[in-house]
Design a protein with these regions (language model features):
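Bacterial N-terminal signal peptides that target proteins for export
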Residues: 1-12
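Short, low-complexity, disordered segments immediately C-terminal to signal peptides
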Residues: 10-17, 25-45
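Extracytoplasmic low-complexity, Pro/Thr/Ser/Ala/Gly-rich segments
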Residues: 34-80, 89-93, 325-339
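Basic- and aromatic-lined ligand-binding clefts that recognize polyanionic substrates
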Residues: 63-66, 71-78, 181-241, 245
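A short, structured surface patch at a secondary-structure boundary
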Residues: 71-123
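Proline-aspartate-enriched helix->loop->beta-strand connector
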Residues: 121-124, 128-134, 152, 262, ...
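Extracytoplasmic substrate-binding proteins
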Residues: 142-145, 149-215, 312-339
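Structured C-terminal subdomain patch of bacterial secreted/periplasmic proteins
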Residues: 265-339
Length: 339
């Protein structure tokens, strides 16, 4: 594929050089027409809508800062390099990035930003960004305005932390003038997920709940990308999850439930993040072990933080990295379930 892409680029370059030579022989009017066409084809200015308003980017950004999750993945996948991106604190590599970004990250080109407690606005400004990409985030309007004072900021378009991986990809692509390339990335990942669904008929219509269990219990809502991608593979949300979503008036990506209420979201398949207590303690717990999914073997307990992160931060780079790691566990749980 790399060889083919190189050939295409070479061909396009040759055409551009030929066009330039011909243009040099033309009239001034021809040159002006070609200049106008070139400006139009660049795709700028572009205006993108977000939950706080509109963001206009007047020219192709060269210095890119990403915030929140996943935006840097799309930037890398589109052949660009961010000058700044968040430092990873959950399941990081030694360099402080995600496992699927490890082969692309270059610390001499990209500054890692500590965004755990609050945004380091001065450090972000010092990077002199042309654009700030945050399509999968949850900051408030005051933060958005501060960031927008530094550079045009592409924020999330709907509820916090619930932008689909497809929309994240498209927003970043449009912001960088690479919409067509972004659409190709989306098609590639969508085709891969369709292939997974076709190769795993045991997933079809099995009810599923995705949650984090331990000291506190969280259930991820249908609008969360980690749930959406499982739906795309063929699973459907457990009735208890759908019922819980009806109470989700604030449109949060997850809801806390008491341990006594965990049975209300039981399903054919339970994807359980148990990195806080470990798989053995989870399975030995009298409440969790009483669940239908656990009794039948329909539970997929996950405690590796990098793999959990890959399932949670759904992107065009994380999906190819994580699928091979989770499909055996998902398949085993779905095959064992009594749904």
């Amino acid at each position: 594929m790399s060889w083919s892409r190189t050939r295409v680029v070479s061909a396009v370059t040759a055409v551009l050089l030929a066009t330039t030579t011909l243009a040099a022989c033309g009239s001034d009017g021809d040159k002006q027409a070609e200049s106008s066409a070139g400006t139009a084809s660049s795709g700028f200015p572009v205006t993108l809508k977000n939950t706080f308003g509109d963001t206009t980017i007047t020219k192709k950004p060269e210095r890119i800062v990403t915030l929140g999750w996943n935006a840097q993945d799309v930037v890398y996948a589109l052949g660009e390099t961010p000058v700044g991106m968040p430092k990873v604190t959950y399941g990081p590599t030694a360099d402080g990035v995600t496992a699927w970004d490890a082969d692309k990250f270059d610390k001499s080109k990209t500054t890692l930003l500590d965004t755990g407690d609050k945004y380091p606005f001065e450090k972000i400004a010092a990077l002199k960004p042309d654009v700030i990409l945050a399509p999968y985030e949850g900051f408030d309007e005051a933060t958005y305005k501060t960031l927008s004072g530094i550079a045009p900021t592409v924020a999330y378009p709907g509820a916090p932390w619930q932008t689909t991986w497809q929309d994240q990809t498209l927003l970043v692509g449009e912001a960088l003038g690479k919409k067509a390339d972004a659409e190709k990335l989306i098609t590639g990942i969508s085709d891969k997920i369709k292939q997974v669904a076709a190769e795993h008929p045991e997933f079809k219509d099995k009810t599923i709940t995705v949650g984090s269990f331990g000291a506190e219990n969280y259930v991820y809502m249908p609008g969360d990308p980690r749930v959406q991608i499982l739906n795309e593979m063929g699973f459907k949300n457990a009735p208890g999850v759908e019922a819980l979503e009806k109470t989700n008036t604030k449109k949060e990506f997850s809801l806390t439930i008491s341990k006594e209420k965990v049975a209300d979201v039981d399903a054919d398949v339970l994807v359980a993040y148990v990195d806080g207590i470990g798989t053995q303690k989870f399975l030995a717990d009298p409440v969790y072990s009483s669940l239908k999914a656990v009794k039948s073997g329909g539970v997929y307990a996950m405690q590796d933080q990098q793999v959990i992160s890959g399932m949670s931060a759904v992107s065009v780079l994380s999906v190819p990295w994580v699928l091979d790691k989770v499909l055996p566990g998902l398949s085993k749980a779905a095959s064992a379930s009594k749904g």
